[in-house]
Amino acid sequence: MNNDIMKFLNIEDKDIIISKILIDGNTKIIYLEKTLKVEYCPACSSRMHSKGKYIRKINHPILQDGYQLKLIVTQRKWRCTNPQCNLYFNDQFNFISKYKQSSNITPYMILNEMKNIHITTAGVARKYNISDTSVHYIFLQYLNIKRLPLPEI
C-alpha cells in the first residue's frame, strides 16, 4: 500500500517509509522517514553515527481537490566516527531541495498555472499555499523575459 501512495504522490524514493497518515479538516498530513541503514562517510569510509532527528514540514500541492497536503519529513543527522574527519551530513530526499519548504514539483505546477493570463499571482499563491512574492520569484527564475525598449521622444 505504501508503494501505491508514493506513486500517487509522485515521490520516487525507495528508501522512504510512510509512518502515519492524518486528515485534519481540509489538510492531509503524511509522515515520512527514511529506512534506517548503516551509513558510511563519503570522505574517509568510516562508519557514521546518527546524532538525532529533526522534522521538516513540506508543502506538496499535488492534490487539486480542495485539500492541502503537508508532508512531515523526519531526517537524520549523521556524524563520522573518525576523529580526524568529523564530517556531518543529513539524510537527503530526492523530491525536496535543501532549505526549501515546498517539494520540487511545486514550481512547475505554479508555472503551469501561470499560463492562464487571467489569474493573478495572489490567486496562485492562495491555491498553492505560498506567498505571492514566492510565486513572482519562481516566475522570474524560470522565465527570461526581456524588457521592451523605452520609446524615443
What is each model feature region?
Residues 1-87, 92-93:
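Short, conserved DNA-binding cores of transcription-related domains
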Residues 60-153:
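Short, positively charged, Gly/Tyr-enriched micro-motifs
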